[in-house]
Amino acid sequence: MAEPEPDGSPVAPATGRRIAALAFPALGVLAAEPIYLLFDIAVVGRLGALPLAGLAIGGLILSTLSSQMTFLSYGTTARSARFFGAGNRTSAVGEGVQATWLALGLGMLIVVVVEAAAVPLVSALAAGGDIATTALPWVRIAIVGVPAILVSAAGNGWMRGVQDTGRPLRYVVAGFAVSAVLCPLLVYGWLGMPRLELVGSAVANLLGQWVAALLFLRSLLAERVPLWVQPEVLRAQVVMGRDLVLRTMAFQACFVSAGAVAARFGAAAVAAHQVVLQLWNFLALVLDSLAIAAQSLVGAALGAGQLAHAKSVAWRVTIFSTLASAVLAGVFAVGASVFPSVFTDDRSVLDAIGVPWWFMVAQLPVAGIVFALDGVLLGAGDAKFMRNATLISALVGFLPLVWLSLAFGWGLLGIWSGLSTFMVLRLAFVGWRAFSGHWLVPGTG
């Protein structure tokens, strides 16, 4: 029997079925973009090395900017879920309204700044020359999609908060489907379309992103909640966003440093590092879907004032995530002699890939716990602690070992030791926080 909320309506128990119902659509949303990007790369790649290099530079700019704004999704989920748990759907959706205004404002600001600075920015990243010339038109067009990307992030946030992960999946898939259809037509000039080559990729991306954003906006309008700007709510969202942005920057500093140092050890080392890192990132998305379920359920339980229920959700999601990560670790341990050859047949890369591969396998069970508890604490709105824990883990664990690897020639062993230390430190921090109960703060404040 579910515990009653203040208005008498029940909070759904955190059964395995309920967690899966939230997690699987969330996984679809998380996986849709990487899958489409692979398709985009395959289409553009047939134009040759130069357009592909231009896409890489443009994609780096767009993904870096977008990843810094993930607080529009995660922060909104935490705040919206508390109101939803308290039985106040209007305020829960209202958080989405304010996040959407913030998304539009930040998005337009980013467009103006990047359009003004596009030439020096692209030239700096591409070191000038033909690559910069090729990338520039893509950047100028694709950047206009940033407001749409951020609106979709805000839409994902409030919908997760009201425990609706089905519609976001449909909207995101619809947007990427439009892009996937248009991309080859515009790149190659098929079916009477103009042959735009690399620019066609940017146009296809832009149109698909705005299709998804308009679907999210339509759903927001259908809720018939007040649409005016509420400065006090925006201020609270910006404060939480600041903490989450700093946390994201710590992640990016670590992985950029790791890639830069790996490159110093030769092509085989950096290729092996990149293969395993991309696989690690994909597995992190799989586990992150459970963390999203935790955010929604924990936030709702705390909003309803049901602390015991929030603790139950935390334990159950952590157990599921740990089991899933252990199974994944087992699969990749058993397949260690086979799976790497799926990604490359280069003997030097295969010889180097063993070190990061076994680090990845060993880290997976730790990651299962860490990512689940990340979701619990983010659902509780404990962003300041998450920021501090990530910054300390990066500055004490990951970055020193990465740069010591360069100084002492430790290679991939040192780099991946840094990542493992980073994960263990995060486990210590979030584990302590979870057991302490400091995150169990009831209400909607």
Question: What is the predicted function of each stretch?
Answer:
Residues 361-370, 375-401:
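A late C-terminal transmembrane helix in Major Facilitator Superfamily
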Residues 1-25, 80-147, 178-185, 193-244, ...:
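Short alpha-helical transmembrane segments in multi-pass integral membrane proteins
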Residues 38-42, 120, 154-158, 181-188, ...:
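Alpha-helical transmembrane segments of multipass membrane proteins
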Residues 21-40, 141, 145, 152, ...:
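Transmembrane helical elements of multi-pass membrane transporters/channels
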Residues 49-60, 136-139, 202, 267-282, ...:
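Small-residue hotspots at the loop-to-helix junctions and early N-terminal turns
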Residues 52-112, 151-168, 272-336, 370-381, ...:
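Small-residue-rich hydrophobic transmembrane alpha-helices
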Residues 31-53, 122-129, 185-196, 249-282, ...:
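Helix-terminus/linker motif at the lipid-water interface of multi-pass membrane proteins
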